[in-house]
Structure formats: structure tokens, C-alpha cells
Amino acid sequence: MKRFKLAMITALVAAMGALAANADTIGYVNYKTVESNYEFAKNAYKELDAEYLNLQQYLMDKEKQYKNIESPIQRKNFEETVQKDFKVKNDNFTKLKMKKAEEVENNIVNAAKAVAAEKKIDVVLDYRVIFTGGTDLTDDVIYYLNNNKKFKKNK
């Protein structure tokens, strides 16, 4: 009976060791930190801010023009024209905003995948879901994105 228990304990320990060897390695990334330190993202958001300011300036200019129109019919026609033009401009801005956001996100995700592969990390999560453990890949992802390098060398 003692040998059976010893054999079972030995088998259990061996099985736990095998499970530990096959366990996924976990890394995490602080997405907001990566995004705020990623030069392409900074430039994309500056471009979007400039476009937004252009939209605001367009509306202010049209408002000034509107105040100078005296005829009710001309005012109505002007309003309709401005509404159509603004809708086109706003739609283009929205498309550009979506395109830039998607491009930034795809670049960050692809960089995280590349860094994880280089560091032999199986799973990458957002830092907010990790309470303890794991490998922080944030700086490596930022380095990869800004320098077109594989990953930052360990310190």
C-alpha cells in the first residue's frame, strides 16, 4: 500500500511538472502607454486635430458669410449648400479618423505579436487584467514601433 501511494505521488508530481512545462508564458502591454509614445500615432492624432480645426474654421467662416446675407431666400439656399458641404467634409473627417485609428491599432497589435514571438511569449494581455506575474512588453513594443527593430535588448 505504501508503494502504491508513493507511486501515485510520484506520478502526480511528474504530471504537475509536465503541465508546468507546457503552460503558456504570459506577457502584457499597457496599450495607452504604447499609443502615447508611438511616433506614428502622435503624428496621426496631430493630423486629425488639424483637420478638426479646419472643420471648425470652415463653420466660423460660413457663419460670417451667413450674417452678411440679407435675403431670406439666399439665406435658405446658403444654409442648404453649407449643410451639404459640411456633411461631405465631416464624413471625410470621420473616415480619416477611423482609418488612422485602425492603422495605429493594427501596428501596435502586430508589434506586440512580433515582440512576443521574439521573446517566446505565448499570450499577450492588456496590463489591466494582470494582477501579478507575467512579462511587461510595453517598452519593447514601443521600441519596436519607433525604431523598426525586432525588440529592445534585455538590460
Language model: regions and residue ranges:
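Bacterial N-terminal signal peptides that target proteins for export
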Residues: 1-8
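Bacterial N-terminal signal peptides
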Residues: 9-17
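Sec/Tat signal peptide C-region and signal peptidase I cleavage site
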Residues: 17-23
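Amphipathic alpha-helical segments
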Residues: 24-131, 148-155
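Short beta-strand-centered segments that line the small-molecule binding cleft or hinge
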Residues: 138
